Amino acid sequence: MMNDFLTEDTKAIILLCGVFGKDRSEKPLSLGEYSSLVRWLIKVKMRPGDLLQKDTIHEASMGSGINKQRLESLLGRGVQLGFAVEEWKRNGIWVISRSDIDYPVRYKKHLKNNAPPLLFGVGNRSLLKGDGLGIVGSRNVDQAGELFTRQVAEFCAYNRMPVVSGGARGVDQISMNATLEAGGVAIGILAENLLKKSVERSARQAIADGCLLLLSPYHPNARFTA
């Protein structure tokens, strides 16, 4: 069932970079460490999924400079990942990685090696491929700012332009709600609580109608700590 939900590449990337389960004995790879590993994979013409074969781990360790035991421990979390996948599926959460065809091209183009290795999402996945207008701003917006935000978001809805925002209180949430209320579509790029946000009453129907996509590079239960 896991193979129907994840590609082999994404499975390997989650094992290496993902936070799940109760075992914290080995720290998942940082973005920099994963990028170093990717450079080695490209050099030897291999893919992340190839690391699921134990006979490749020694070479990967030597080529990337990442401790072999750490790689083995992270890649050995298959049982824990299986439980996590079942929970994500129950809650309508899907996962894509930088190696997947659905991964946003703009992320790779503009962020390059800094593009998140993983993206967790809920909702209309096809919205990843379209255009959009970013609307972000203060959490404590005044009345004039709120009115302007609503006008711009409604204009986007009428012109079939998705609104892309952060989903936080204030301008972000106002813009997303306004475009949805006007019959448009919205994409929320979240820094925390993807799961919690996806089950809120205001989001559930829009997700079911295919009008809302919630996306996060962090674990679905992660909280914002900055």
Can you describe what each PLM-predicted range is?
Residues M1-R24, R90-N91, R98-A226:
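Glycine-biased, small-residue-rich flexible motifs in mid-sequence functional cores and linkers
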Residues M1-S99:
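Short, small/acidic-rich helices and loops at N termini and domain boundaries
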